[in-house]
Amino acid sequence: MKRIVAIALVLLIGLPLAAQARLGGSGAQFLVYGGGCRSVAMGGAYVALADGIDAVYFNPAGLANLDAPTFAFNHGELYADINLENVAFATPTMGGVVGFSGVAFLSGEMLRTTFEDQEGRSGETFTANDFAFGLSYARMMTDKFTAGLTFKYISQNIDQVSANSWAFDLGGTYSVGVGDLKLGFAIRNFGPDLRYTGEDLEFDAGLPDYPEVDEDIPANYKSEAFPMPLMFQLGITYDLISEGANRLTAVLDGLHPNDQDETFVAGLEYGFNDSYFARVGYNGRQNMGLTAGLGARAALSAGIMASVDYSYENHEYLDPIQRFSFSISY
């Protein structure tokens, strides 16, 4: 535990300088959207609560709480006909829990325009799709402390150029021992910069001043490198009410990104009979705001549980984001 905390502190100390130098300058922004309606409906304040399959996106340490194989799918409808698809699977094994995750940020077909054809009269189209694939491992280090790690491969693609890299997430949760009070932290998207390469950046330099020389000179435009959206998140969760069939859970997280000012996210979840849920939250990240959602969970048969969830995210300038998710454990 001491080693993990030391790593977290070293990275945290370096983040303020990075944030000032790269304000608004990181790439792979699709990684910031997270996944799973429960966590999103509470404003993304999930780093301490992290007790379900959604933990694979926010704090891998939370996967250690899973006691059965679990599969989850999430569909998000964003602005400009963009879709965000998330899929995750986790199962107890190897003395802990192993998880797999995939994220797809899909633009759909867009009309190709060029300097010569600025209205796209050719009718040609292209896509801008981003993907991330993760492998996670989490385990209970003590009866109070969990730790987890995710390694992921990231690929951003625009037509015939792409930028590929890798990153990892590191997290932990700690049960204080006072009621249901729990603390959590996560460092996400720590990895090398991305840089676009590909066919659309290739050209023939030629010798325009010497037309008599008929020779191709292949060359490439070199794109500028851009950093990952590095994030340090520290949170707390506590059950304000836990009586009979009623439970009210509060969550509060502080965010320290490398490309925005520090902010916070917060949320509440009311659960009845551990089967029906109503959620509300606030996402303090730039241009975001109120969030909300509903959920239900039921036993399909002996040992098989299924959950369906919905979330709504307001946006200051763009259309609201709606997500739907389904998960099953067996």
Task: Report each predicted region and the residues it spans.
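Outer-membrane beta-barrel porins/channels
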Residues: Q20-V40, L84-Y330
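Short, basic and Ser/Thr-rich N-terminal targeting/leader segments
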Residues: D51, D67, I82-N83, F131
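Short strand-turn segments of transmembrane beta-barrel domains in outer membranes
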Residues: G44-V47, P69-Y79
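Sec-dependent N-terminal signal peptides
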Residues: I4-L15
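Outer-membrane beta-barrel biogenesis signature
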Residues: A18-D67
